[in-house]
């Protein structure tokens, strides 16, 4: 018995030592991994940046991370640390489009901390997005910008791209574990409207299997600017946008030719509805740019519309491919040997930086469905999405974005409809005293239109887009002093934020802003007649109670209250209800869209009370207010558009590309 006890105790002791040794080994491995990761991250530190302005250099890291070892697939990143921490840590990932266009466009021409004054000189970007968030630019997919891969291994599918990106993030967080618990936002523009939802879906799937080793990532929101999301609505928007901007006049031979091509496009989409790109539809934009070209510019060449900003003209057939003007400095700057060295570019990257790699675009031939099919599930998973548009962009224009929102069903509703016949109000946005656009919001989706802006909204208005970002992220900077910016919706001053280099006052009262939004929604209900119905129901209930009491008095069964006077009869007619263009018609892309230019008042068409017979008396008219035609609410027929970028030498934007 004693021997048995001794043996048992010895066994337990041995088991305890095994457990302890396992814990020690795990701790040692963890410590070693952390040490290796820390040492590895130091290799990515950017010690200096040629041409940077005087003063402290923004803390940054850059370099390559291998994602597909079998074919040398490496993604390049450039990370900028936030200048301030406001109530929580946040990281914003930025992606440009193409497919195959470098995110260094975003870093040096849009939202990064620096912009190029010329090819040798950097200046601070007033409105950079790294004020209250770390910003991570990634050249995605492999082969784009500074990223590289074997020439026979370009990706073909969106799911493949997303898997590579998740691998990148896992290895990036292993190098920089201090950011893995950040609120994570994914932002970008143009063809990134396909990439971002697929990456988000892959992250959500990964999070389902998260554990002690694979930590859950705090995916907190998506921002897509002038995105290519839903081909059906966006191809259909080309011609509609051209009509509204007077690029093409209805009834002309040119209009008839383009309408024929549009019908060919629509037929192809009807037959094959799940594609992302259609040559028959790309031809609408190509033909439009060619057939509207005319006049001779300073270069002696015919002039065509800039497809990224229709207020501008360009030499045909460039039509915007050399735009924006900063691009002429970005390419030579990123090809400088000292810049390549500073950004820790691998020697395996044998070719110089190009804005858009045509090989990436030509090899990308996805069979996966357009990203519009993913948005409802992402929204229902609790991930907020913000879509924003520049009003002067042709290729991915705002009409198409508004149409795809109007036709999309998510979180128990369709489009921005709050209840049948009642639409979320469009709230006029002024920024520092100037009309900036409008905001519209419902069920976790936000839409922002920027007046007087192009395909690359942050290029035009970095300060306004920073204000948009901070509000979307719910930045609370109450602990930081400074002069706040003046940003208002419907004339009401918003919770205070800051843009540019100076810190702002406070955005702590996010609840107050939500309350204002609820008030605006209630105003929409009131205008549409919903409030009248509520009053009638309540009044009918009160009247019924008085009738019951009087009957009990007459029967001698009730108590005797205050002496009663005349009974008041309450009509059960709820009064006029805002029909909202025939109720469901607007949600099918019909209704009042043809009359959007008729509006001259401040109220939303969807929220106004009117008799349906008045539709017969409406006529098209051109508003004098340059913003009037931009304020109609989502829910009617509207279109958006996309772009192609023909070659322009070594940094060519390829046909069909949306950067």
Curated annotation (Swiss-Prot):
<keyword id="KW-1133">Transmembrane helix</keyword>
<dbReference type="InterPro" id="IPR018202">
    <property type="entry name" value="Ser_caboxypep_ser_AS"/>
</dbReference>
<dbReference type="InterPro" id="IPR001563">
    <property type="entry name" value="Peptidase_S10"/>
</dbReference>
<keyword id="KW-0472">Membrane</keyword>
<keyword id="KW-0378">Hydrolase</keyword>
<feature type="topological domain" description="Cytoplasmic">
    <location>
        <begin position="549"/>
        <end position="659"/>
    </location>
</feature>
<protein>
    <recommendedName>
        <fullName>Pheromone-processing carboxypeptidase kex1</fullName>
        <ecNumber>3.4.16.6</ecNumber>
    </recommendedName>
</protein>
<feature type="transmembrane region" description="Helical">
    <location>
        <begin position="528"/>
        <end position="548"/>
    </location>
</feature>
<feature type="active site">
    <location>
        <position position="190"/>
    </location>
</feature>
<keyword id="KW-0325">Glycoprotein</keyword>
<feature type="topological domain" description="Lumenal">
    <location>
        <begin position="39"/>
        <end position="527"/>
    </location>
</feature>
<feature type="active site">
    <location>
        <position position="455"/>
    </location>
</feature>
<keyword id="KW-0812">Transmembrane</keyword>
<feature type="signal peptide">
    <location>
        <begin position="1"/>
        <end position="38"/>
    </location>
</feature>
<feature type="region of interest" description="Disordered">
    <location>
        <begin position="565"/>
        <end position="659"/>
    </location>
</feature>
<dbReference type="GO" id="GO:0006508">
    <property type="term" value="P:proteolysis"/>
</dbReference>
<feature type="glycosylation site" description="N-linked (GlcNAc...) asparagine">
    <location>
        <position position="444"/>
    </location>
</feature>
<dbReference type="Pfam" id="PF00450">
    <property type="entry name" value="Peptidase_S10"/>
</dbReference>
<keyword id="KW-0333">Golgi apparatus</keyword>
<feature type="compositionally biased region" description="Basic and acidic residues">
    <location>
        <begin position="616"/>
        <end position="630"/>
    </location>
</feature>
<feature type="region of interest" description="Disordered">
    <location>
        <begin position="480"/>
        <end position="507"/>
    </location>
</feature>
<feature type="compositionally biased region" description="Polar residues">
    <location>
        <begin position="649"/>
        <end position="659"/>
    </location>
</feature>
<dbReference type="GO" id="GO:0004185">
    <property type="term" value="F:serine-type carboxypeptidase activity"/>
</dbReference>
<feature type="glycosylation site" description="N-linked (GlcNAc...) asparagine">
    <location>
        <position position="348"/>
    </location>
</feature>
<feature type="glycosylation site" description="N-linked (GlcNAc...) asparagine">
    <location>
        <position position="218"/>
    </location>
</feature>
<keyword id="KW-0645">Protease</keyword>
<dbReference type="InterPro" id="IPR029058">
    <property type="entry name" value="AB_hydrolase_fold"/>
</dbReference>
<keyword id="KW-0732">Signal</keyword>
<feature type="active site">
    <location>
        <position position="393"/>
    </location>
</feature>
<feature type="glycosylation site" description="N-linked (GlcNAc...) asparagine">
    <location>
        <position position="505"/>
    </location>
</feature>
<dbReference type="GO" id="GO:0006915">
    <property type="term" value="P:apoptotic process"/>
</dbReference>
<dbReference type="GO" id="GO:0005802">
    <property type="term" value="C:trans-Golgi network"/>
</dbReference>
<dbReference type="GO" id="GO:0016020">
    <property type="term" value="C:membrane"/>
</dbReference>
<comment type="function">
    <text>Protease with a carboxypeptidase B-like function involved in the C-terminal processing of the lysine and arginine residues from protein precursors. Promotes cell fusion and is involved in the programmed cell death.</text>
</comment>
<comment type="similarity">
    <text>Belongs to the peptidase S10 family.</text>
</comment>
<feature type="glycosylation site" description="N-linked (GlcNAc...) asparagine">
    <location>
        <position position="452"/>
    </location>
</feature>
<keyword id="KW-0121">Carboxypeptidase</keyword>
<keyword id="KW-0053">Apoptosis</keyword>
């Amino acid at each position: 018995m004693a021997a048995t006890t001794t043996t048992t105790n010895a066994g337990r002791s041995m088991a305890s030592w095994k457990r302890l040794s396992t814990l020690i080994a795990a701790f040692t491995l963890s410590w070693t991994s952390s040490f290796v990761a820390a040492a590895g991250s130091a290799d990515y530190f950017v010690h200096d940046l040629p041409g940077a302005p005087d003063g402290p250099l923004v803390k940054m890291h850059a370099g390559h991370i291998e994602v597909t070892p079998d074919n040398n697939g490496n993604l390049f990143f450039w990370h900028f640390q936030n200048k301030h921490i406001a109530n929580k840590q946040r990281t914003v990932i930025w992606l440009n489009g193409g497919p195959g266009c470098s995110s260094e466009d975003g870093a040096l021409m849009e939202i990064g901390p620096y912009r190029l004054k010329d090819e040798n000189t950097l200046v601070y970007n007033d409105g950079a997005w790294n004020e209250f968030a770390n910003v991570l630019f990634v050249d995605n997919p492999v082969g784009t910008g500074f990223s590289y891969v074997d020439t026979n291994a370009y990706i073909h599918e969106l799911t493949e791209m997303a898997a590579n990106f998740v691998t990148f993030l896992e290895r990036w967080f292993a190098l920089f574990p201090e950011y893995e618990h950040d609120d994570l936002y994914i932002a970008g523009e143009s063809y990134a409207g396909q990439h971002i939802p697929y990456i988000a879906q892959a992250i959500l799937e990964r999070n389902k299997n998260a554990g002690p080793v694979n930590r859950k990532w705090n995916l907190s929101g998506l921002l897509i600017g002038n995105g290519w999301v839903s081909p059906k609505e966006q191809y259909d928007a080309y011609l509609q946008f051209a009509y509204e901007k007077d690029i093409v006049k209805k009834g002309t031979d040119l209009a008839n030719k383009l309408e024929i091509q549009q019908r060919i496009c629509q037929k192809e989409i009807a037959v094959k509805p799940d594609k992302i790109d259609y040559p028959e539809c790309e031809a609408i934009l190509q033909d439009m740019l060619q057939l509207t070209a005319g006049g001779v510019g300073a270069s002696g060449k015919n002039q065509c519309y800039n497809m990224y900003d229709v207020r501008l003209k360009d030499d045909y057939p460039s039509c915007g491919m050399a735009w924006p003007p900063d691009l002429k400095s970005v390419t030579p700057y990123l090809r400088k040997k000292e810049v390549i060295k500073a950004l820790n570019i691998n020697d395996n990257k044998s070719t110089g930086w190009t804005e858009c790699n045509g090989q990436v675009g030509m090899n990308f031939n996805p069979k996966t469905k357009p990203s519009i099919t993913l948005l409802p599930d992402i929204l229902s998973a609790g991930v907020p999405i913000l879509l924003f548009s520049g009003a002067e962009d042709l290729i991915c224009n705002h009409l198409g974005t508004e149409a795809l929102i109007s036709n999309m069903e998510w979180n128990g509703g369709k489009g921005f409809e709050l209840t049948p016949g009642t639409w979320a109000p469009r709230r006029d946005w002024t920024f520092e005293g100037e009309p900036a656009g409008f905001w519209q919001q419902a069920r976790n989706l936000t839409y922002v239109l920027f007046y007087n802006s192009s395909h690359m909204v942050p290029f035009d208005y970095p300060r306004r887009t920073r204000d948009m970002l901070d509000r979307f992220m719910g930045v609370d900077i109450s602990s930081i002093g400074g002069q706040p910016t003046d940003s208002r919706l419907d004339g009401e001053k918003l919770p205070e934020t800051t843009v540019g280099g100076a810190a702002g006052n406070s955005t702590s009262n996010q609840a107050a802003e939500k309350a204002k939004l609820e008030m605006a929604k209630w105003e929409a209900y009131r205008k549409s007649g919903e409030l009248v119905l509520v009053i009638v129901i309540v009044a009918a209930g009160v009247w019924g109670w008085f009738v019951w009491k009087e009957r009990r008095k007459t029967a001698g069964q009730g108590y005797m209250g205050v002496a009663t006077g005349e009974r008041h009869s309450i009509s059960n007619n709820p009064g006029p209800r805002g029909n909202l263009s025939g109720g469901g018609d607007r949600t099918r892309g019909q209704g009042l869209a043809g009359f959007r230019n008729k509006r001259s008042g401040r109220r939303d068409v969807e929220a106004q009370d009117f008799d349906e017979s008045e539709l017969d008396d409406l006529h098209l008219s051109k508003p004098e207010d340059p913003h009037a035609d931009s304020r109609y609410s989502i829910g009617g027929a509207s279109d958006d558009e996309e772009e192609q970028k023909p070659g322009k030498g070594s940094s060519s934007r390829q046909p069909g590309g949306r950067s």
